[in-house]
């Protein structure tokens, strides 16, 4: 059955209606920018509601393989699991893929379909046109530019994880031979081990594999390649691994949370800051529950419960 027919059945629309809608789908995005944590902006391209519905239906209809080393956008996994995988190792390497989502094109997607070593959906030639319209965004509406994966589409996390499957599979196998632990959280690659100097050769291995699989489309962001060890603070996707091999919020974040709780205690936070603090406390409870226990003891269960919206 064709992709259009399956989507039409699930969405209770006509084949012709969906086909006509998809012709201009890559231009049906609202674009805005949000500041990055350090410098610059991240471009978010959010699809129109009708296109979102089609994208969600597509990734529910077709099961794309995702490697076990992938920690982002997966039910039951998250940044805590990503950091915990490396907690018992002394030496750490962090690497970053440059402009990750926007570097994934239809050509990469189809190449990954062809070369996947896992069970992967197969499509009829006539489906190709519409699948590209469903999944990819055209950044400049009035000029014929190449299609790319957008940050903001509900299908993009699934497709990005799938497109990295073969990379994850091969780098994981290579790491296993060297007793290196490997995980990937979206564009963040993390490697760790207990053998000195083994990680030094990993960046060149990553680059060679990226070139082999994706040509020059996916690249390392060399400014974000960081080596660290137990002698220094080790941070993995925002989580600190301390020398006792347990996960921590880190000293600075704890100090900041305590400051905000104190501000709240004396009525000095506005509603926006309260909501932000509530989110920080939920994160803290997930990463380091003992810290929340200590805050309950210091500031009282009543105040902390009120802050978290429990009463």
Swiss-Prot record:
Write out the function statement from the record: Reverse transcriptase (RT) component of antiviral defense system retron Ec78, composed of a non-coding RNA (ncRNA), this reverse transcriptase (RT), a probable ATPase and a putative HNH endonuclease. Expression of retron Ec78 confers protection against bacteriophage T5. At multiplicity of infection (MOI) of 0.02 cultures slow growth when infected with T5 but do not collapse, at MOI 2 cultures enter growth stasis. Responsible for synthesis of msDNA-Ec78 (a linear ssDNA with a 5'-terminal phosphate residue). Unlike most known msDNAs the mature product does not have an RNA component.
Q: Which reaction does it catalyse?
A: DNA(n) + a 2'-deoxyribonucleoside 5'-triphosphate = DNA(n+1) + diphosphate
User: Has UniProt tagged this entry with the keyword RNA-binding?
Assistant: yes
Originating organism: Escherichia coli
- The Enzyme Commission number assigned here is 2.7.7.49
Record family assignment = Belongs to the bacterial reverse transcriptase family.
**InterPro entries in alphabetical order:** DNA/RNA_pol_sf, GrpII_Intron_Splice-Mob/Def, Reverse_transcriptase_msDNA, RT_dom
GO terms assigned for molecular function: metal ion binding; RNA binding; RNA-directed DNA polymerase activity
Q: Which GO terms describe its biological process?
A: defense response to virus
User: What is this protein's gene name?
Assistant: ret
What keyword terms does UniProt attach to this protein?
Antiviral defense, Magnesium, Metal-binding, Nucleotidyltransferase, RNA-binding, RNA-directed DNA polymerase, Transferase
Residue ranges occupied by any Reverse transcriptase domain in the UniProt entry: 15-241
Q: Which of this chain's residues are annotated to bind Mg(2+)?
A: 96, 187-188
Its recorded name reads Retron Ec78 reverse transcriptase
């Amino acid at each position: 059955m064709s992709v259009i027919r399956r989507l039409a059945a699930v969405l209770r629309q006509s084949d012709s209606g969906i086909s006509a809608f998809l012709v201009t789908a890559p231009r049906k995005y609202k674009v805005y920018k949000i500041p990055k944590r350090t410098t610059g902006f991240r471009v978010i391209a959010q699809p129109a509601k009708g296109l979102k519905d089609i994208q969600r239906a597509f990734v529910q209809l077709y099961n794309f393989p995702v490697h076990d080393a992938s920690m982002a956008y997966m039910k039951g996994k998250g940044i805590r699991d990503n950091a915990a995988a490396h907690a018992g190792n002394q030496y750490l390497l962090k690497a970053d893929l440059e402009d990750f989502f926007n570097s994934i094109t239809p050509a990469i997607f189809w190449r990954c379909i062809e070369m996947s070593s896992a069970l992967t959906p197969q499509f009829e030639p006539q489906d190709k046109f519409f699948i590209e319209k469903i999944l990819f965004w055209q950044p400049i509406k009035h000029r014929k530019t190449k299609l790319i994966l957008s940050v903001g589409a509900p299908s993009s996390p699934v497709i990005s994880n799938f497109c990295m499957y073969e990379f994850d599979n091969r780098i994981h196998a290579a790491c296993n031979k060297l007793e290196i632990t490997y995980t990937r959280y979206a564009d963040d690659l993390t490697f760790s081990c207990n053998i000195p100097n083994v990680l030094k050769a990993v960046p060149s291995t990553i680059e060679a594999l990226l070139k082999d699989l994706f040509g020059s489309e996916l690249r390392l962001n060399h400014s974000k390649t960081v080596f660290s060890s137990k002698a220094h603070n080790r941070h993995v996707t925002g989580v600190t691994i301390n020398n006792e091999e347990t996960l921590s919020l880190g000293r600075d974040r704890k100090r900041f949370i305590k400051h905000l709780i104190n501000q709240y205690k004396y009525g000095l936070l506005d509603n926006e800051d309260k909501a932000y603090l509530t989110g920080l406390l939920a994160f803290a409870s997930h990463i380091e529950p003992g810290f929340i226990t200590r805050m309950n003891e210091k500031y009282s269960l009543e105040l902390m419960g009120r802050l978290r919206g429990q009463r």
